[in-house]
Amino acid sequence: MQAKATDSRQEPTLNMDTNARRNFIKFHAKLGEKPATTVRFFDHTDRYTVHGSDDCELVAKIVYKSTAFIGALLPDDKKETLQFVSMSKGNFELAVRELLLVRNYRVEVYVKNSSDWEIEYRGSPGNLLQFEDILFSNKEVLVGNSIISLLVKLDGGGQRRVGVASVEQNDCKFQLLEFLDDDFFTELEATVVLLGPKECLLPSIEGEYSAVKTLLDRNGVMITMPKKSGDNDLLQDLNRLLRFAKGQQEDATGLKELQLQLASNALKTAIKYLDLVNDAGNLGHYEIKQLDLNRFVHLDSAAVAALNIMPKPGTHPSMPSYRWQSVLGVLDHCRTPQGHRLMGQWVKQPLRSRNILNDRHNIVQCLLESPDTMETLSLDYLKRIPDILMLTKKLMRRKANLQDLFRIYQVILRTPKILKVLHELDNSTIESVICAPFKSFLKDLTGLKQMVEQVVDFEAIERGEYLVKASFDSRLMELQQMMTELYSKMEELQFKCSQELNLDGKNQVKLESVAKLGHHFRITVKDDSVLRKNKNYRIVDVIKGGVRFTSDKLEGYADEFASCRTRYEEQQLSIVEEIIHVAVGYAAPLTLLNNELAQLDCLVSFAIAARSAPTPYVRPKMLEEGARELVLEDVRHPCLELQEHVNFIANSVDFKKEECNMFIITGPNMGGKSTYIRSVGTAVLMAHIGAFVPCSLATISMVDSILGRVGASDNIIKGLSTFMVEMIETSGIIRTATDKSLVIIDELGRGTSTYEGCGIAWSIAEHLAKETKCFTLFATHFHEITKLAETLSTVKNCHMAAVADADDFTLLYQVRSGVMEKSFGIQVARLANFPEHVVQNAQEVYNEFEDEHVDKQKKEDKALLEKIQVAIQQLSTAGNNVDINVEDLTQLVTQFTKDIEQLDSDYFKSVLATSEA
């Protein structure tokens, strides 16, 4: 079946003679080794190739889903041959898009010059400039394109200072920050999660940077070590790149952001690597600001994975799985590309500002109370908004045309209609947060709107043509007159043709024009027989919509018309260039308008997500950080409840300062422990984004971090065992968590021996409950840890309920108070359809171990009784001896205690624990 699929789109073979192939093999060998994450393409004008076994296999699987298309340049010479895969331009673009945007590979394209091959284009996940036309032509840009550069410096006192510079090329934005960090780079990881870079520039991967490399690998960020070059002048570069306010001196010297010297040096490296200064489209359009991490809730990579915040790489919003695979998919009902991008930022950047969150919640509530308005905004207005940011970038790079300018004009026309709909809601928050900025931006864009109306020929647009008004130039007037006359003649031929073929009314002959055919006639397929009888006309082609045909006269007029049209477009080029030059001056208000429309799209999306859920979401009541309260009634997991054939059983959580700050959750495997703690974490995250939450009631105090340790899988590729991953992630939690944090931990300590694992889990749970006092959901199989509730009043035990008898085992997925008294491992194995003989064997082994334990306890109990009898006799004798002193008596009791301790008796331990309590 696969062979048939690939044969249907067979690629051209590599048309090179034997001598040319041998020369190419020699050239390819001279290129030497390349990084495994770099793929080299070779442009043969009419096709592209990749070479080498690794690149061929990778690209063949991307393009053809098969390695059957891998060939050999010299199939008869196995010693000197070189593998290759050949592909069309369309498949080359498909491969480049997959490599750069999904798989985080670098791409190089070589072009043949007169005598040799030279590299023409380079691209990486964080530097897509040279591939933008390939990647985003007729494609929505749904993800950000950011790159970071960082430097690490050890201060005199041994403190580790990190300087980070982020460059967002889509938004033309520089962000700088510096901070002190620990040996594990905890703050740096939070920064990487927050910014979501595709690529990171490092000066080295050794020494201090070795741990940084490990962190970046863990977060799926490509690492690049740029070549050291001559010192570029940062101030000079910024003076050219930055957009200064009107009246502001164009001098970056006094910018407060540049006081961050380490981050500034990192920025200098990024500007040089991206070659920003040599692209005229960047000049005068960038903004620079200092990033404040304290504005955002701290997220580590473990929490991002545990809460399923982001979908799997390559998952497009149009895919069915996108909706339930991640929190982003659940919330993302955006209609615009800029809305999709902003939503991706928001879910990774939960806020700590209660005021901003209340504004977002107010707007979402208002939209939910006006469902007709919500649908109008989503389906009628936002759906028709193009990607203004990408259109603005085309303007800045002087690659825009009149059609692009007209699309921007349409947005300027539609925005007042959106404003009118929003005004009708009569909501003060919407007026201040959305409407007021819209009015300001529209005022700034008045000049652009007027220019388009004066210059663009709107009548031509109705015919699908984008032309400058002829009144702007005498030669244009002349050419337009010629085209008008030619069109009139073609209409006369159309009328004459209808009469000749005896077609009128609905069946009349239509005059049409398409790019490949020019002007032609068209009739319905059922009238085909009438046409074939007339020798004055000849059929061009037959399509589903009808029969296209022409005549000698029509063809002559059509050719003349096309010639006039070409000359018209050539004549208007200089005028269009001047219009685009003027339009570039409106880049700033266009960018702001784009951002405001993206924000509206996200808020409407929140409302749609809240209403369309199986059970509608509710507005969370947000309290200040110090309130320390988390009450969620009937909380559900937003992803799980969207899946088919799932009837979600909701549960609740109730944390209050000084009353309860930790749930220790026990219960059988598959009983719902992980889902429960993730549901709580996800609800808190959604509230801090500004969305409503999947509960029946929610009261949430602001948190400063959401930290997680969920799941246990060996990270073999990075050389880390289950236990090492556990320890790395958990140590990060201990270092970062405060009394304002939410921590979710699942099955900690299972990667090592039972006793060590239990000891570590106990110690961490006790530290979080007693010292940190953060809100913690601690799911565990170590029932011993439930004893913490006996010594710490703020720790509560709960379990996932299950019912079992001799034949049946039912998981109830309900959280109930108290400890799960019984283990159900064997029942779960049977539920998972283990072979019955395996289950029976497990039961026998279990019974054997339990019998041994009982026998051991019986022996220990007998020995204990003997010791007690001896002790009683000795104490009785001592008590009757009036000459015995206190020291001798104390020594006797102490020895008795030691003897019993050596017996390792459970009974004695419980008595001792009770007496100590």
Curated annotation (Swiss-Prot):
Q: Name one Pfam family in it.
A: MutS_III
Q: Name a single GO cellular component.
A: nucleus
Give the superkingdom in one word. Eukaryota
Q: Which UniProt keywords apply?
A: ATP-binding, DNA damage, DNA repair, DNA-binding, Nucleotide-binding, Nucleus
Among Gene3D superfamilies, the record links this protein to:
1.10.1420.10, DNA repair protein MutS, domain I (3.40.1170.10), MutS, connector domain (3.30.420.110), P-loop containing nucleotide triphosphate hydrolases (3.40.50.300)
PROSITE patterns from the UniProt entry: DNA_MISMATCH_REPAIR_2
Q: Name one GO biological process term.
A: mitotic recombination
Subunit structure of this chain's protein: Heterodimer of Msh2/Spel and Msh6.
Q: What's this protein's family per the entry? A: Belongs to the DNA mismatch repair MutS family.
Give a short account of what the protein does: Involved in postreplication mismatch repair. Binds specifically to DNA containing mismatched nucleotides thus providing a target for the excision repair processes characteristic of postreplication mismatch repair.
Q: What is this protein called?
A: DNA mismatch repair protein spellchecker 1
